[in-house]
Protein backbone atom coordinates (compact mmCIF):
# COMPACT_ATOMS: atom_id res chain seq x y z
CA UNK A 1 0.00 0.00 0.00
CA UNK A 2 1.64 3.24 -1.19
CA UNK A 3 0.59 6.10 1.05
CA UNK A 4 0.36 9.72 -0.09
CA UNK A 5 0.97 11.77 3.04
CA UNK A 6 1.16 14.90 0.92
CA UNK A 7 -2.59 14.54 0.44
CA UNK A 8 -3.61 13.17 3.80
CA UNK A 9 -3.15 10.60 6.53
CA UNK A 10 -5.03 7.69 8.07
CA UNK A 11 -4.77 6.94 11.78
CA UNK A 12 -6.42 4.13 13.74
CA UNK A 13 -7.44 5.51 17.13
CA UNK A 14 -9.07 2.42 18.62
CA UNK A 15 -9.72 -1.25 17.96
CA UNK A 16 -12.86 -1.52 20.09
CA UNK A 17 -14.81 0.01 18.61
CA UNK A 18 -12.75 0.36 15.46
CA UNK A 19 -12.18 4.10 15.19
CA UNK A 20 -10.25 5.65 12.30
CA UNK A 21 -9.33 9.27 11.65
CA UNK A 22 -8.84 10.56 8.10
CA UNK A 23 -7.06 13.91 7.83
CA UNK A 24 -6.49 16.08 4.76
CA UNK A 25 -3.06 17.76 4.65
CA UNK A 26 -2.93 21.52 5.08
CA UNK A 27 -3.32 23.51 1.89
CA UNK A 28 -4.82 20.73 -0.25
CA UNK A 29 -7.37 22.27 -2.59
CA UNK A 30 -9.50 21.78 -5.66
CA UNK A 31 -8.30 23.25 -8.94
CA UNK A 32 -10.60 26.26 -8.44
CA UNK A 33 -8.60 26.96 -5.22
CA UNK A 34 -11.46 25.97 -2.94
CA UNK A 35 -10.08 24.01 0.04
CA UNK A 36 -10.63 20.26 0.04
CA UNK A 37 -11.85 19.47 3.54
CA UNK A 38 -14.28 17.68 5.83
CA UNK A 39 -17.30 18.74 3.77
CA UNK A 40 -15.94 16.76 0.82
CA UNK A 41 -15.18 13.74 3.00
CA UNK A 42 -18.53 13.86 4.76
CA UNK A 43 -20.39 14.00 1.44
CA UNK A 44 -18.41 11.02 0.21
CA UNK A 45 -19.25 9.11 3.39
CA UNK A 46 -22.94 9.96 2.98
CA UNK A 47 -22.88 8.71 -0.61
CA UNK A 48 -20.82 5.55 -0.14
CA UNK A 49 -22.33 4.43 3.16
CA UNK A 50 -25.90 4.50 1.91
CA UNK A 51 -27.01 5.65 5.36
CA UNK A 52 -29.49 8.13 3.95
CA UNK A 53 -30.73 5.97 1.06
CA UNK A 54 -34.45 5.29 1.03
CA UNK A 55 -36.93 3.47 -1.18
CA UNK A 56 -36.25 1.57 -4.38
CA UNK A 57 -34.08 2.73 -7.25
CA UNK A 58 -34.86 2.29 -10.95
CA UNK A 59 -32.65 2.65 -14.00
CA UNK A 60 -33.29 3.65 -17.59
CA UNK A 61 -33.34 0.45 -19.63
CA UNK A 62 -31.47 1.96 -22.58
CA UNK A 63 -28.82 4.12 -20.92
CA UNK A 64 -28.51 2.40 -17.56
CA UNK A 65 -28.73 5.82 -15.87
CA UNK A 66 -30.53 6.09 -12.56
CA UNK A 67 -34.02 7.58 -12.73
CA UNK A 68 -34.50 10.10 -9.89
CA UNK A 69 -37.28 9.10 -7.51
CA UNK A 70 -39.00 10.76 -4.61
CA UNK A 71 -36.47 9.62 -2.01
CA UNK A 72 -32.82 10.23 -1.22
CA UNK A 73 -30.62 7.75 -3.07
CA UNK A 74 -26.87 8.02 -3.67
CA UNK A 75 -26.05 5.54 -6.44
CA UNK A 76 -22.51 4.74 -5.29
CA UNK A 77 -20.46 1.79 -6.53
CA UNK A 78 -19.08 1.40 -3.00
CA UNK A 79 -22.47 0.54 -1.50
CA UNK A 80 -22.20 -2.65 0.51
CA UNK A 81 -18.49 -2.20 1.25
CA UNK A 82 -16.69 -1.13 4.42
CA UNK A 83 -18.07 2.39 4.57
CA UNK A 84 -21.56 0.89 4.91
CA UNK A 85 -20.30 -0.30 8.28
CA UNK A 86 -20.10 3.31 9.51
CA UNK A 87 -23.67 4.31 10.29
CA UNK A 88 -23.16 7.19 12.71
CA UNK A 89 -22.27 10.60 11.29
CA UNK A 90 -18.47 11.03 11.48
CA UNK A 91 -17.04 13.65 13.81
CA UNK A 92 -15.22 16.61 12.25
CA UNK A 93 -11.93 17.92 13.68
CA UNK A 94 -8.62 19.64 12.94
CA UNK A 95 -10.24 22.90 11.87
CA UNK A 96 -12.43 21.10 9.39
CA UNK A 97 -9.70 18.95 7.82
CA UNK A 98 -10.48 15.59 9.42
CA UNK A 99 -13.33 13.15 9.93
CA UNK A 100 -13.37 10.28 12.40
CA UNK A 101 -15.21 7.07 11.56
CA UNK A 102 -16.54 4.76 14.26
CA UNK A 103 -17.20 1.38 12.68
CA UNK A 104 -20.19 -0.63 13.89
CA UNK A 105 -18.08 -3.78 13.77
CA UNK A 106 -14.43 -4.64 13.01
CA UNK A 107 -13.39 -4.18 9.39
CA UNK A 108 -10.07 -5.55 8.20
CA UNK A 109 -9.64 -3.18 5.22
CA UNK A 110 -10.03 0.05 7.17
CA UNK A 111 -6.97 1.56 5.44
CA UNK A 112 -8.60 1.05 2.04
CA UNK A 113 -12.23 1.70 2.93
CA UNK A 114 -12.20 5.43 2.28
CA UNK A 115 -10.56 6.97 -0.78
CA UNK A 116 -9.77 10.59 -1.54
CA UNK A 117 -12.92 12.62 -2.32
CA UNK A 118 -13.62 12.59 -6.04
CA UNK A 119 -16.64 14.92 -6.05
CA UNK A 120 -16.31 18.51 -4.76
CA UNK A 121 -18.98 19.07 -2.11
CA UNK A 122 -19.26 22.78 -2.81
CA UNK A 123 -20.04 22.14 -6.48
CA UNK A 124 -22.75 19.62 -5.60
CA UNK A 125 -24.47 22.02 -3.21
CA UNK A 126 -24.07 25.05 -5.48
CA UNK A 127 -25.86 23.25 -8.30
CA UNK A 128 -28.36 21.28 -6.23
CA UNK A 129 -29.35 24.05 -3.82
CA UNK A 130 -28.76 27.11 -6.04
CA UNK A 131 -26.02 28.55 -3.84
CA UNK A 132 -23.47 30.95 -5.32
CA UNK A 133 -20.80 31.02 -2.61
CA UNK A 134 -18.48 28.01 -2.19
CA UNK A 135 -18.11 28.41 1.58
CA UNK A 136 -21.85 28.73 2.04
CA UNK A 137 -22.32 25.66 -0.13
CA UNK A 138 -19.92 23.62 2.02
CA UNK A 139 -21.76 24.70 5.15
CA UNK A 140 -25.03 23.58 3.55
CA UNK A 141 -23.55 20.13 2.88
CA UNK A 142 -22.38 19.78 6.47
CA UNK A 143 -25.71 20.92 7.88
CA UNK A 144 -27.75 18.61 5.66
CA UNK A 145 -25.70 15.56 6.61
CA UNK A 146 -25.34 16.32 10.31
CA UNK A 147 -29.04 17.14 10.66
CA UNK A 148 -30.27 14.37 8.38
CA UNK A 149 -32.13 16.95 6.32
CA UNK A 150 -33.63 14.83 3.54
CA UNK A 151 -35.14 17.87 1.83
CA UNK A 152 -31.61 19.13 1.15
CA UNK A 153 -30.02 15.70 0.70
CA UNK A 154 -32.48 14.66 -2.03
CA UNK A 155 -31.38 17.24 -4.66
CA UNK A 156 -27.75 16.78 -3.64
CA UNK A 157 -28.01 13.01 -4.16
CA UNK A 158 -29.66 13.54 -7.54
CA UNK A 159 -26.88 15.88 -8.65
CA UNK A 160 -24.20 13.61 -7.18
CA UNK A 161 -25.64 10.76 -9.29
CA UNK A 162 -25.91 12.54 -12.62
CA UNK A 163 -24.44 16.03 -12.49
CA UNK A 164 -20.96 14.85 -13.44
CA UNK A 165 -22.16 12.48 -16.16
CA UNK A 166 -20.89 13.93 -19.43
CA UNK A 167 -19.16 12.67 -22.55
CA UNK A 168 -17.77 15.99 -23.79
CA UNK A 169 -16.09 18.83 -21.93
CA UNK A 170 -18.82 20.83 -20.18
CA UNK A 171 -19.07 24.59 -20.55
CA UNK A 172 -19.14 24.82 -16.75
CA UNK A 173 -15.57 24.29 -15.45
CA UNK A 174 -16.85 23.50 -11.96
CA UNK A 175 -17.95 20.12 -13.29
CA UNK A 176 -14.41 18.94 -13.96
CA UNK A 177 -12.42 20.17 -10.99
CA UNK A 178 -9.51 18.09 -9.72
CA UNK A 179 -7.43 17.88 -6.56
CA UNK A 180 -4.53 15.95 -8.08
CA UNK A 181 -1.60 16.87 -10.34
CA UNK A 182 -3.71 16.98 -13.51
CA UNK A 183 -7.03 18.47 -14.54
CA UNK A 184 -9.17 17.74 -17.61
CA UNK A 185 -8.63 20.34 -20.33
CA UNK A 186 -10.39 18.63 -23.24
CA UNK A 187 -12.80 15.75 -23.73
CA UNK A 188 -14.43 14.50 -26.92
CA UNK A 189 -16.89 11.63 -27.26
CA UNK A 190 -16.91 11.74 -31.06
CA UNK A 191 -13.12 11.49 -31.29
CA UNK A 192 -12.81 9.34 -28.14
CA UNK A 193 -10.07 11.16 -26.28
CA UNK A 194 -9.41 13.03 -23.05
CA UNK A 195 -6.64 15.56 -22.50
CA UNK A 196 -5.14 16.21 -19.08
CA UNK A 197 -3.09 19.31 -18.32
CA UNK A 198 -0.89 19.97 -15.30
CA UNK A 199 -2.98 21.49 -12.50
CA UNK A 200 -1.45 24.90 -11.78
CA UNK A 201 -3.25 25.03 -8.42
CA UNK A 202 -2.12 21.58 -7.26
CA UNK A 203 -0.86 21.30 -3.69
CA UNK A 204 0.89 18.05 -2.82
CA UNK A 205 4.00 15.91 -3.27
CA UNK A 206 3.26 14.42 -6.70
CA UNK A 207 4.29 17.21 -9.02
CA UNK A 208 3.50 16.46 -12.69
CA UNK A 209 6.49 15.58 -14.88
CA UNK A 210 4.68 16.10 -18.21
CA UNK A 211 2.65 19.21 -19.00
CA UNK A 212 -0.04 17.62 -21.18
CA UNK A 213 -1.24 14.04 -21.62
CA UNK A 214 -3.85 12.94 -24.15
CA UNK A 215 -5.43 9.52 -23.75
CA UNK A 216 -7.36 8.07 -26.69
CA UNK A 217 -9.81 5.20 -26.42
CA UNK A 218 -10.23 2.57 -29.11
CA UNK A 219 -11.80 -0.83 -28.50
CA UNK A 220 -9.95 -2.27 -31.53
CA UNK A 221 -6.36 -3.21 -30.58
CA UNK A 222 -5.21 -3.39 -34.21
CA UNK A 223 -6.41 0.18 -34.72
CA UNK A 224 -4.26 1.14 -31.73
CA UNK A 225 -1.24 -0.45 -33.41
CA UNK A 226 -1.97 1.45 -36.62
CA UNK A 227 -2.20 4.74 -34.72
CA UNK A 228 1.14 4.01 -33.07
CA UNK A 229 2.71 3.24 -36.44
CA UNK A 230 1.31 6.48 -37.86
CA UNK A 231 2.93 8.49 -35.08
CA UNK A 232 -0.43 9.53 -33.63
CA UNK A 233 0.35 7.89 -30.29
CA UNK A 234 3.48 7.45 -28.18
CA UNK A 235 2.30 4.60 -25.95
CA UNK A 236 -0.43 1.99 -26.39
CA UNK A 237 -1.74 -0.75 -24.12
CA UNK A 238 -3.78 -3.00 -26.42
CA UNK A 239 -5.40 -6.23 -25.42
CA UNK A 240 -3.02 -8.92 -26.60
CA UNK A 241 -3.87 -11.26 -29.46
CA UNK A 242 -1.62 -13.16 -31.85
CA UNK A 243 -2.51 -10.67 -34.59
CA UNK A 244 -1.58 -7.71 -32.37
CA UNK A 245 1.82 -9.19 -31.52
CA UNK A 246 2.51 -9.86 -35.20
CA UNK A 247 1.46 -6.34 -36.17
CA UNK A 248 3.68 -4.77 -33.50
CA UNK A 249 6.67 -6.77 -34.69
CA UNK A 250 6.32 -4.99 -38.01
CA UNK A 251 6.51 -1.49 -36.51
CA UNK A 252 10.01 0.02 -36.55
CA UNK A 253 11.43 1.82 -33.53
CA UNK A 254 8.91 0.43 -31.07
CA UNK A 255 9.68 -1.39 -27.82
CA UNK A 256 7.15 -4.11 -27.01
CA UNK A 257 6.78 -5.29 -23.42
CA UNK A 258 4.63 -8.34 -22.68
CA UNK A 259 3.74 -10.09 -19.46
CA UNK A 260 1.08 -11.72 -17.34
CA UNK A 261 -1.44 -9.53 -15.52
CA UNK A 262 -4.29 -10.06 -13.09
CA UNK A 263 -7.13 -9.61 -15.59
CA UNK A 264 -9.44 -12.53 -16.28
CA UNK A 265 -12.24 -13.03 -18.77
CA UNK A 266 -15.54 -13.93 -17.14
CA UNK A 267 -19.16 -14.59 -18.02
CA UNK A 268 -21.88 -13.21 -15.71
CA UNK A 269 -25.51 -14.34 -15.65
CA UNK A 270 -28.27 -11.83 -14.83
CA UNK A 271 -30.74 -12.92 -12.16
CA UNK A 272 -33.28 -10.08 -12.14
CA UNK A 273 -34.12 -8.88 -15.65
CA UNK A 274 -37.06 -11.11 -16.53
CA UNK A 275 -34.77 -13.21 -18.72
CA UNK A 276 -33.98 -16.93 -18.90
CA UNK A 277 -31.93 -16.95 -15.68
CA UNK A 278 -34.46 -15.00 -13.58
CA UNK A 279 -36.84 -16.99 -11.32
CA UNK A 280 -39.53 -14.38 -12.08
CA UNK A 281 -39.66 -15.71 -15.64
CA UNK A 282 -40.93 -19.01 -14.25
CA UNK A 283 -43.45 -17.59 -11.80
CA UNK A 284 -40.85 -17.30 -9.05
CA UNK A 285 -39.66 -20.89 -9.43
CA UNK A 286 -36.03 -20.65 -8.30
CA UNK A 287 -35.32 -24.32 -9.02
CA UNK A 288 -36.24 -23.94 -12.69
CA UNK A 289 -34.11 -20.82 -13.07
CA UNK A 290 -31.19 -22.55 -11.39
CA UNK A 291 -31.43 -25.53 -13.74
CA UNK A 292 -31.34 -23.21 -16.75
CA UNK A 293 -28.33 -21.35 -15.32
CA UNK A 294 -26.52 -24.60 -14.62
CA UNK A 295 -27.24 -25.86 -18.12
CA UNK A 296 -25.83 -22.70 -19.65
CA UNK A 297 -22.66 -22.84 -17.56
CA UNK A 298 -22.03 -26.37 -18.80
CA UNK A 299 -21.79 -25.03 -22.36
CA UNK A 300 -19.00 -22.48 -21.68
CA UNK A 301 -15.87 -23.87 -23.42
CA UNK A 302 -13.30 -22.31 -21.12
CA UNK A 303 -10.42 -24.56 -22.09
CA UNK A 304 -11.17 -24.05 -25.77
CA UNK A 305 -10.88 -20.30 -25.22
CA UNK A 306 -7.48 -20.88 -23.61
CA UNK A 307 -6.29 -23.20 -26.37
CA UNK A 308 -7.44 -21.13 -29.35
CA UNK A 309 -7.15 -17.54 -28.14
CA UNK A 310 -4.85 -17.26 -25.12
CA UNK A 311 -2.30 -20.09 -25.40
CA UNK A 312 -0.68 -18.70 -28.59
CA UNK A 313 0.34 -15.71 -26.45
CA UNK A 314 0.85 -17.42 -23.11
CA UNK A 315 1.35 -21.20 -23.28
CA UNK A 316 1.19 -21.37 -19.47
CA UNK A 317 -2.28 -19.79 -19.24
CA UNK A 318 -4.91 -21.73 -17.34
CA UNK A 319 -8.57 -21.40 -16.48
CA UNK A 320 -9.34 -19.56 -13.28
CA UNK A 321 -11.72 -21.22 -10.85
CA UNK A 322 -12.11 -18.49 -8.24
CA UNK A 323 -13.61 -15.02 -8.49
CA UNK A 324 -11.63 -13.81 -5.48
CA UNK A 325 -8.16 -15.36 -5.80
CA UNK A 326 -5.72 -15.78 -8.68
CA UNK A 327 -4.16 -19.20 -9.36
CA UNK A 328 -1.07 -19.73 -7.23
CA UNK A 329 -2.07 -17.23 -4.55
CA UNK A 330 -2.49 -18.27 -0.90
CA UNK A 331 -5.81 -19.99 -0.31
CA UNK A 332 -6.64 -20.46 -3.99
CA UNK A 333 -6.57 -24.25 -3.97
CA UNK A 334 -8.64 -24.46 -0.78
CA UNK A 335 -11.25 -22.10 -2.21
CA UNK A 336 -11.49 -24.04 -5.47
CA UNK A 337 -12.01 -27.31 -3.60
CA UNK A 338 -15.17 -26.00 -1.96
CA UNK A 339 -16.66 -23.33 -4.24
CA UNK A 340 -18.49 -25.62 -6.66
CA UNK A 341 -16.46 -24.67 -9.73
CA UNK A 342 -15.90 -28.35 -10.45
CA UNK A 343 -19.51 -28.47 -11.69
CA UNK A 344 -18.68 -26.49 -14.84
CA UNK A 345 -15.01 -27.47 -15.10
CA UNK A 346 -15.64 -29.25 -18.40
CA UNK A 347 -18.17 -28.69 -21.17
CA UNK A 348 -20.95 -31.27 -20.89
CA UNK A 349 -23.56 -30.79 -23.62
CA UNK A 350 -25.45 -33.97 -22.76
CA UNK A 351 -25.78 -32.92 -19.12
CA UNK A 352 -26.88 -29.43 -20.17
CA UNK A 353 -29.60 -30.93 -22.35
CA UNK A 354 -30.76 -33.11 -19.44
CA UNK A 355 -30.99 -30.09 -17.15
CA UNK A 356 -33.04 -28.12 -19.67
CA UNK A 357 -35.36 -31.09 -20.05
CA UNK A 358 -35.68 -31.35 -16.27
CA UNK A 359 -36.47 -27.63 -16.13
CA UNK A 360 -39.25 -28.19 -18.64
CA UNK A 361 -38.39 -25.10 -20.69
CA UNK A 362 -38.99 -24.75 -24.39
CA UNK A 363 -35.84 -24.80 -26.50
CA UNK A 364 -33.99 -23.09 -27.94
CA UNK A 365 -33.69 -20.75 -24.95
CA UNK A 366 -32.86 -17.22 -26.10
CA UNK A 367 -29.92 -15.65 -24.25
CA UNK A 368 -28.53 -12.21 -25.14
CA UNK A 369 -24.80 -11.75 -24.48
CA UNK A 370 -23.32 -8.28 -23.96
CA UNK A 371 -19.64 -7.70 -24.84
CA UNK A 372 -17.36 -5.15 -26.48
CA UNK A 373 -18.28 -5.45 -30.15
CA UNK A 374 -15.00 -4.11 -31.56
CA UNK A 375 -12.88 -6.10 -29.12
CA UNK A 376 -11.32 -8.86 -31.22
CA UNK A 377 -10.75 -11.25 -28.33
CA UNK A 378 -14.27 -10.88 -26.95
CA UNK A 379 -15.83 -11.25 -30.40
CA UNK A 380 -13.85 -14.47 -30.90
CA UNK A 381 -14.95 -15.74 -27.50
CA UNK A 382 -18.58 -14.96 -28.29
CA UNK A 383 -18.39 -17.13 -31.41
CA UNK A 384 -17.05 -20.07 -29.41
CA UNK A 385 -19.73 -19.63 -26.75
CA UNK A 386 -22.52 -19.35 -29.33
CA UNK A 387 -21.49 -22.54 -31.13
CA UNK A 388 -21.28 -24.56 -27.93
CA UNK A 389 -24.51 -23.16 -26.47
CA UNK A 390 -26.47 -24.01 -29.62
CA UNK A 391 -25.52 -27.67 -29.25
CA UNK A 392 -27.27 -27.78 -25.87
CA UNK A 393 -30.44 -25.90 -26.78
CA UNK A 394 -29.55 -22.25 -26.29
CA UNK A 395 -29.76 -19.48 -28.88
CA UNK A 396 -26.97 -17.09 -27.90
CA UNK A 397 -27.97 -13.71 -29.32
CA UNK A 398 -25.21 -11.28 -30.28
CA UNK A 399 -25.56 -8.27 -27.98
CA UNK A 400 -22.12 -6.86 -28.82
CA UNK A 401 -21.96 -3.11 -28.22
CA UNK A 402 -19.04 -0.69 -28.04
CA UNK A 403 -20.91 1.12 -25.26
CA UNK A 404 -21.07 -2.08 -23.23
CA UNK A 405 -19.61 -0.50 -20.10
CA UNK A 406 -22.48 1.95 -19.73
CA UNK A 407 -24.99 -0.88 -20.15
CA UNK A 408 -23.70 -3.05 -17.31
CA UNK A 409 -26.40 -3.53 -14.69
CA UNK A 410 -29.11 -2.14 -16.96
CA UNK A 411 -30.98 -5.45 -17.33
CA UNK A 412 -30.97 -5.16 -21.12
CA UNK A 413 -29.02 -8.41 -21.57
CA UNK A 414 -28.98 -11.88 -20.00
CA UNK A 415 -25.27 -12.58 -19.80
CA UNK A 416 -22.16 -10.46 -20.17
CA UNK A 417 -18.56 -11.07 -21.16
CA UNK A 418 -15.80 -8.73 -20.01
CA UNK A 419 -12.69 -8.67 -17.86
CA UNK A 420 -12.12 -8.07 -14.17
CA UNK A 421 -8.77 -6.91 -12.85
CA UNK A 422 -7.45 -8.49 -9.67
CA UNK A 423 -5.41 -5.47 -8.65
CA UNK A 424 -6.88 -4.50 -5.28
CA UNK A 425 -5.13 -5.13 -1.99
CA UNK A 426 -8.33 -5.40 0.03
CA UNK A 427 -9.26 -8.65 1.74
CA UNK A 428 -12.95 -7.78 1.50
CA UNK A 429 -12.98 -6.07 -1.90
CA UNK A 430 -15.39 -8.63 -3.35
CA UNK A 431 -18.22 -7.47 -1.06
CA UNK A 432 -19.28 -4.74 -3.49
CA UNK A 433 -19.74 -7.36 -6.20
CA UNK A 434 -21.48 -10.16 -4.35
CA UNK A 435 -23.57 -8.50 -1.65
CA UNK A 436 -27.13 -7.86 -2.81
CA UNK A 437 -26.75 -4.16 -1.97
CA UNK A 438 -23.26 -3.93 -3.43
CA UNK A 439 -22.72 -1.02 -5.77
CA UNK A 440 -20.75 -3.30 -8.09
CA UNK A 441 -23.37 -6.05 -8.15
CA UNK A 442 -24.33 -5.95 -11.82
CA UNK A 443 -26.25 -9.22 -11.95
CA UNK A 444 -28.94 -8.98 -9.28
CA UNK A 445 -27.40 -11.89 -7.38
CA UNK A 446 -28.73 -12.11 -3.82
CA UNK A 447 -27.83 -14.53 -1.05
CA UNK A 448 -28.79 -14.02 2.60
CA UNK A 449 -25.71 -15.91 3.79
CA UNK A 450 -23.39 -13.69 1.75
CA UNK A 451 -25.16 -10.54 2.95
CA UNK A 452 -24.68 -11.67 6.53
Q: For each predicted feature, which ranges?
A:
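Surface-exposed binding/hinge segments that line
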Residues: 21-23, 61-159
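Short, glycine/acidic-rich hinge or "gate" loops at secondary-structure transitions
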Residues: 58, 312-322
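A structural "hinge/loop" feature
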Residues: 1, 6, 110-122, 268, ...
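Extracytoplasmic/periplasmic ligand-capture domains
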Residues: 16-56, 173-176, 180-309, 328-452
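Primarily extracytoplasmic ectodomains and periplasmic/lumenal surface modules that are beta-strand-rich
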Residues: 29-31, 106-110, 316
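Short, exposed beta-strand/loop patches in secreted or surface proteins that constitute
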Residues: 9-13, 89-92, 184-187
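Gly/Pro-rich hinge or "lid" segments in bacterial periplasmic/extracellular proteins
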Residues: 119-205
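N-terminal lobe/hinge region of extracytoplasmic solute-binding protein
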Residues: 1-15, 177
